[in-house]
Regions:
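Arg/Lys-enriched, amphipathic patches
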Residues: 1-115, 129, 157-161, 174
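Amphipathic alpha-helical interface elements that mediate macromolecular binding in regulatory proteins
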Residues: 2, 6-9, 13, 24, ...
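Active-site palm subdomain of RNA-directed nucleic acid polymerases
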Residues: 26, 259-272, 296-300, 305
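Intrinsically disordered, low-complexity regulatory regions enriched in Ser/Pro/Gly/Thr
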Residues: 56, 72-73, 216-219, 235-237, ...
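Residues immediately flanking
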Residues: 84, 175, 183, 228-230, ...
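Conserved catalytic palm subdomain of right-hand nucleotidyl-transferase polymerases, strongest
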Residues: 105-107, 179-186, 235-244, 285-320
Length: 320
């Protein structure tokens, strides 16, 4: 695992240098090539050769394609605009996202507006530190006594058996190619494109983690980005934290998810309609509506009913 992590860091450094040479100045290269094309066309119109015009046009098309792909990756959109050139669309998407995600200020716990950069970061740090820190609960054994055992011996045997190279290959192929990268700076597309070359080393590292239960600390490093839930967010709770993980970490978690997937319908209660295949979160909305309708229209008998609505904020962030 350490050897692969070191290779990724070295590759990232080399790719940054390569990107600067080939993409960093692409706008200037396009402007310069357009100027050369204009001069070549002018010379050809005066009786010169048309050969340079064709050559420069090909070079310009390559540069324009680079620019389009660069902005498409930055936009990270799944929708492909129709037409020959999508650069302006992708540039607009990327710029709009950057502008929308910029945090100009936030209200603190007292409701006072804070706009200083250090104060804003401190407010978010304090909130999420409190959210993700355990509260030292007691008597967990008594709680677990009331949880019915649903994983039978055959299921457990399948879940704990050693992971294989095939499971790692399936996991990397299932990942969206241009998802935002984590601290490693690599999108899944890099691994997918060069899997034939880097696959054996990466698979060995992933399997060492899955089958030993140990993970290198640097692989677990994660960027947290805050996405606004509303158009003009004013409080910390109006932002949704998104974790940008290293690709190796994503492969590990994807392989585990694939292993669990066939058993989820048997493990997860039928009352839970989200996060499992062939179930819709809208089903529970219909059940709630029908239940309330029955309670409202029920007129026979003396037995009454009561509905209790619980709003558990951040219910999936911590289990204790």
């Amino acid at each position: 695992m350490f050897r692969v992590s070191k290779k990724i860091k070295k590759c990232k450094k080399m790719l940054k240098s390569w990107s600067k040479d080939h993409f960093g100045s692409v706008k200037r290269q396009i402007a310069k090539t357009k100027e050369l094309l204009w001069k070549a066309e002018e010379d050809a119109a005066k009786g010169g050769s048309y050969g340079p015009v064709s050559q420069i046009r090909r070079e310009l098309n390559v540069l324009l394609d680079k620019e389009s792909r660069m902005w498409k990756q930055r936009a990270r959109t799944q929708w492909v605009a129709k037409g020959d050139k999508n650069t302006s669309y992708f540039h607009g998407v990327a710029t709009q996202r950057k502008r929308r995600n910029f945090i100009k200020g936030i209200k603190d716990e007292e409701g006072v507006w804070q706009s200083a950069k250090g104060t804003i970061s401190g407010i978010f740090m304090e909130y999420y530190t409190r959210l993700f820190t355990q509260s030292n609960p007691h008597e967990l054994d008594r709680v677990l006594e009331g949880v019915q055992q649903v994983v039978i011996a055959d299921m457990n045997a399948e879940l704990v058996k050693p992971y294989t190279m095939e499971e790692v290959d399936i996991a990397i192929k299932q990942m969206a190619p241009l998802k935002a990268p984590g601290p490693d700076g690599m999108p899944p597309l890099f691994y997918q494109s060069f899997w034939e070359k880097i696959g054996p080393d990466v698979s060995e590292a992933v399997l060492s983690c899955l089958n030993s239960g140990t993970l290198l600390k640097s692989i677990n490093h994660t960027f947290i980005t805050l996405i606004p839930k509303v158009n003009n967010p004013e409080t910390v709770m109006e932002f949704r934290p998104i974790s940008l993980c290293n690709v190796i970490y994503k492969i590990i978690s994807k392989a585990i998810a694939n292993r669990l997937k066939p058993f989820l319908n048997s493990i997860v209660s039928e009352a839970q309609s989200a996060f499992t295949a062939d179930r819709l979160i809208a089903d529970n909305i219909l059940i709630a509506f029908e239940s309330l309708h029955y309670m409202k229209t029920q007129i026979l008998g003396r037995e009454g009913f009561m509905a209790l609505k619980l709003d558990m904020s951040k219910a999936y962030n911590r289990v204790e």
